Amino acid sequence: MTQDIHAHRILILDFGSQYTQLIARRVREAGVYCEIYAWDAPETAIRDFGAAGFILSGGPESMTVDNGPRVPEAVFQAGVPVLGICYGMQAMAGQLGGRVEASDHKEFGYARVRARGHSRLLRDIEDHASPEGWGLLDVWMSHGDRVTGLPPGFKLIASTESCPIAGIGDDERGYYGVQFHPEVTHTPQGARILSRFVHEICGCPADWTPGNIVDDLIERVRRQVGGDKVLLGLSGGVDSSVVAALLHRAIGDQLTCVFVDNGLLRKDEGDQVMATFARHMGVNVIRVDAEARFLEALKGVDDPERKRKIIGNMFIEVFDEQAARLTEVDWLAQGTIYPDVIESAGSATGKAHVIKSHHNVGGLPEDMTLKLVEPLRELFKDEVRRIGLELGLPADMVYRHPFPGPGLGVRILGEVRKEYADLLREADAIFIEELRAHDLYDQVSQAFAVFLPVKSVGVTGDGRRYEYVVALRAVETIDFMTARWAHLPYEFLDHVSRRIINEIPGISRVAYDISGKPPATIEWE
């Protein structure tokens, strides 16, 4: 029996902040398990969670209006520490007898906070020291309202020139509030502050580690499926690859993977998947060559949404055909991860600003008889990657750039043809190869080539060429919600362009996409 790595846990109540998942990731990085509930989740669910501490997120609402979101009474009745961040601090202060007011001076962006070191939360944590010896913190602010009166039992623990009450604390009860955001990277000491809260104040040990998570998942999978057979659709993406490695470690030959090669994958991707899983790891993988079927279904279709639906439906059709032949299978495995399952079902009133519901596979038939096993559903993407490394997957597979579900089908503008897919595969491979060779691959968040179905005149030697155009796209982003185009060196782009044009008959021109998100999206379709 492995140790219970969920025993010491933190509950984060989401008041609608864009940073709520970031709070959870920081707590997990500190080695402590946590979950996110909506601020108006049923009080019984909050009590039953058994939290060692609560974190109240920021949010877009105001405590100065009558119907602003409130902290559930179950939080203050639990007798455990509470940390309020931004709106969470204001809500806690207002409900415990303090005063919160709207302010004419809104504070967004960098600020320097004077940290009064007499609190358990901030003691000895600082970026700088003032001439008078006060500890100073560089932080990220994002607020309009502010606390103007301390609740009974609280003391001032942080302040700025424009926000005299930027942090409050009641050491006896373990209640703290900070007006700034410790979860963002713009607050350099933020990880230390959150670690201090979960470890020293809440008393949680650092049990949430990749090795412990793998042991826990293996034990739970074995308990869930017993001696039954399990089927997994293996795409070559990070999530399904980690599920395959994990299930193979847990149940061995009880796992069968179906890898559908739709002809819209990156260069040599199908062979790489088979080499990693079938030959190297010994996983039972059925490879289905369905290129002709996918291309036939896409013939004459140029609308991006129709292409997506056709590719998705065709994948399900091919997968179902294979599943029907495996009559002894009882379970369907999926690579659902935690952001997929944070949904409004946790909201009692329906007013909470929470992330939309999402299911890993939208095309599951209603009459499906297979039971679902989703071993990654508690994990964030960065945790999935660390688990992949722990399971022995190659780093270049685990840290590969995101690839859309429809594959090259949405990187070929307009109609998808085999000729276009073959040209794009080669151009994309050269771009990625050179990014790796110049140590640029890990400096960008996503990079790929796009096929433009237009011809452009070119010159080779004494002859003219009238051939196709590809665009290169590389972006830098933290969350993929916004992104800036990567400012790759001109010499590098020149080198890549010359290689593509010289080495790929059929391409005569290369463009570089310098559009940010917004206004553009990262993918072209």
Swiss-Prot record:
It is an enzyme of class 6 (ligase). InterPro entries: Class_I_gatase-like, GATASE, GMP_synth_C, GMP_synth_GATase, GMP_synthase, GMPS_ATP_PPase_dom, NAD/GMP_synthase, Rossmann-like_a/b/a_fold. SUPFAM superfamilies: Adenine nucleotide alpha hydrolases-like, Class I glutamine amidotransferase-like, GMP synthetase C-terminal dimerisation domain. Residues 9-207 form the Glutamine amidotransferase type-1 domain. Gene3D superfamilies: 3.30.300.10, 3.40.50.880, HUPs (3.40.50.620). Keywords: ATP-binding, Glutamine amidotransferase, GMP biosynthesis, Ligase, Nucleotide-binding, Purine biosynthesis. Pathway: Purine metabolism; GMP biosynthesis; GMP from XMP (L-Gln route): step 1/1. It catalyses: XMP + L-glutamine + ATP + H2O = GMP + L-glutamate + AMP + diphosphate + 2 H(+). GO terms for cellular component: cytosol. The active site is at residues 86, 181, 183. ATP binds at residues 235-241. Its EC number is 6.3.5.2. GO terms for molecular function: ATP binding; GMP synthase activity. Residues 208-400 form the GMPS ATP-PPase domain. Disulfide bonds: none annotated. Homodimer. HAMAP family: GMP_synthase. Catalyzes the synthesis of GMP from XMP. This is GMP synthase [glutamine-hydrolyzing]. It comes from Alkalilimnicola ehrlichii (strain ATCC BAA-1101 / DSM 17681 / MLHE-1). The lineage of its organism: Bacteria, Pseudomonadati, Pseudomonadota, Gammaproteobacteria, Chromatiales.
